[in-house]
């Protein structure tokens, strides 16, 4: 009976500490050390939340950089996060990629892969610099801007690898589109 009491007591203490104490301590530390990130890295404009730096959004106008396609529900639905689960040889996936490539095609240049394929999460907020530079002529034409100005903006908005070795260079689509709106 003594072992049973010890086991039950240990279970209750563990549940309280791990189920309540630890999450509250971590939440408090996150709010204290990284308050912006702990609250979702929200981007606010004119007092209104317009998005998160961490969750992609759909941009479809010719004057905006387009995000990666999303397989997460209807657009960038965070509640339906996930890839398409279609194999690379699946005819439906091949057809989707071909349609996206045809829609993005500009001249003889090959469309960067991240403009025609969804990510594993379906919520990526970033594109590669190659995908951004690929879209630059369309954006410059739609906004009546010099191509050099759009290319300069891409260079300024490109984030390097973290610590010089983690990840790949990337461009946050929401951030660069907001900068475009400020330019024009």
UniProtKB/Swiss-Prot annotation:
Cystine residue pairs: none
GO cellular component, one term: plasma membrane
Subcellular compartments: Cell inner membrane
Highest taxon listed in the record's lineage: Bacteria
Membrane topology term: Single-pass membrane protein
Membrane-spanning ranges: 6-26
Keyword Cell membrane carried by entry: yes
Any matching Pfam family: KdpC
InterPro entries associated with the record: KdpC (IPR003820)
Family: Belongs to the KdpC family.
Complex and partners: The system is composed of three essential subunits: KdpA, KdpB and KdpC.
HAMAP family to which the protein is assigned, alphabetical: KdpC (MF_00276)
Protein name: Potassium-transporting ATPase KdpC subunit
